[in-house]
Amino acid sequence: MDTDSHILKPSMTAKTTKVIVLTTVMFTFISFWRAAAVVIGDLGSTAYYMGGIAEQFVGTVAPYFILGVMIFAFCVMALYLESSPLFTRGGVYRVVKSTLGGWFAKVSVSALVFDYILTGPISSVSGGHYLAGLLNDTLKVFGIDIQFDRNILSMAVAIVIVLFFWWENVKGIEESSSKALKIFIITAIMGALVIVWGIVTLLLKDEPFFAHFPPLEINLSHESYGWLSNAEWAKTIGLISILIAFGHSLLALSGLETLGQVYREVEYPKLKNFKKTALIIFLFSVTLTPGVSFLGTMLIPDNVRPQYIDNLIGGIAMFLIGPHWLNLVFQAFVVIVGVLILSGAVNTSIVGANSVLNRVAEDKVLTEWFRKPHKKYGT
């Protein structure tokens, strides 16, 4: 026994080796909650418009396909969980270059960055439109005869939002993700209120709860067939109609690609926390986006619903049980949250684009200027 203790003693008292990492920039790591909030900043915003857009093309069956897309998102997340931990210098550029060649690598990276560049400004302008509409409606309610130009005001708001999140990301992802987490919390509260309040409203109606569910009938519009619109044979094949309907609902996945970009910033234990990040994103998206789409179809009358195509949650707020003034207050709250989450989509696009450009710069594709750290913040 003494001999065994003597043998084990050196290994038990061995000192941990200290490692010093030399780097040109400051490392910053964030929690899985913050990482999830960054991705949801873009992914969650689709709840405002996805149901209305999909219904225009596929009819009232849209909520079922949106639910299917969000379940499919779990499979996409599984791919990210498997591929993101595999360190590949240069990221998507290096992977595509080694498999398809340099030209395809440049096209793929350019397309990805272009997607992020479009996402930010479009989301911020949309948020500006929501805010401008709310401001003009509020002034009208209080009898103030002043109406702001929605286009100019939305542009001004968009510029402020983009500059704000750009500066937050200059200070580091810890700063920008903190703002994203606050937006995520407010959005989660709003989503819970909408879904619970909506279910209660349906339960208190005379008809049975399940009688309100939309019928499982695909009614594709002429435009939804695209280049197959004149092919009558295609309209007779059910599988083609299902695939087209599914395709028109894929927009609900917008922003999910940022999940692969935030992996490097997730704190230790990295893979375990990354799995938690994916789980939070899945539970949030599979609840809010399809839930809003179903409630929009079940609560808002068919002849009124087209008015709320771009803001389905705002329409739901007006048909919830309760006094009219409470509906108006809740609708204003929904619009404000919409402005916030659309602003969060700007942060998501900046984080994603920054990560892609960093990977490409590390592979010496871009000049050294892109890798130059900030003098004050080291980012």
Language model: regions and residue ranges:
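Flexible loop linkers connecting adjacent transmembrane helices
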Residues: 11-18, 78-104, 125-144, 171, ...
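Extracellular loop-to-transmembrane helix junctions
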Residues: 51-111, 121-161, 282-286, 290
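Extracellular/periplasmic helix-exit of transmembrane alpha-helices
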Residues: 81, 198-212, 276-319
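Loop-to-transmembrane helix boundary motifs in multi-pass membrane proteins
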Residues: 102-105, 147-159, 265-289, 358-379
